[in-house]
A protein has these predicted regions:
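General structural signal for secondary-structure boundaries
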Residues: 1, 32-33, 144-145
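A generic alpha-helix structural signal
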Residues: 1, 51, 149-152
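Short glycine-rich substrate-engagement loop in P-loop NTPases that contacts/grips substrate
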Residues: 1-7
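Conserved, well-folded catalytic cores of nucleic-acid-processing
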Residues: 6, 22-25, 103-106
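Short, high-confidence coil segments that cap the C-terminus of an alpha-helix
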Residues: 9-11
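P-loop NTPase motor core
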Residues: 13-95
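Conserved GTP-binding G-domain of TRAFAC-class P-loop NTPases and closely related GTPase folds
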Residues: 70-157
Length: 157
């Protein structure tokens, strides 16, 4: 918490590498300190506190995370797959992205003689990728975080 607070005051760009590892450490800590429901209560409150602390008007905050494919049951009985940020527990499952302004998913696109590393900028119906309207004209852009940050700076200038 102190490191994040200090970074948000002193840096223009803050990178949280990796949110997934942070959640793993958080659950391990909670399991050492608490039992039963108190483990999940501590875990969920800590995630909420962290997500809230990252919201600011000064710094651009970049969070990396591992994604997972989750089967979702529809009211009709059918299923569909969705790809989203992986977290343990149910409270924040599928909900982390709603706290973020921009969500990019990495994609590896293989051509006949090439491999292209990309960011997916908006949902294809499976991912929870999202960007502000008009920020990027293409569904896939080069995997270059500097370009993304420069685009954000121009967009909000």
């Amino acid at each position: 918490d102190k490191a994040i607070a200090t970074s948000l005051v002193n840096a223009d760009i803050v990178v949280i590498e990796s949110f997934t590892k942070y959640c793993e450490i958080l659950i391990e800590t909670a399991q050492k300190m608490y039992k039963g429901y108190d483990v999940w209560s501590y875990y969920n409150k800590a995630i909420r506190k962290t997500l809230d602390s990252l919201k600011n008007e000064k710094s651009t905050v970049v969070i990396t995370a591992i994604d997972e494919i989750v089967k979702i049951m529809q009211p009709t009985g059918g299923e569909y797959n969705t790809r989203r940020i992986k977290v343990q527990g149910k409270v924040h499952e599928g909900c982390i992205e709603k706290e973020l302004l921009l969500v990019l998913f990495t994609e590896v696109r293989r051509g006949k003689d090439s491999i292209e590393y990309c960011f997916q900028t908006n949902s294809d119906g499976i991912t929870s990728a999202k960007t502000p309207l008009g920020l990027f004209k293409d569904l896939y852009i080069p995997n270059d975080l500097n370009t993304v940050i420069t685009s954000l700076e121009k967009y909000y200038a």
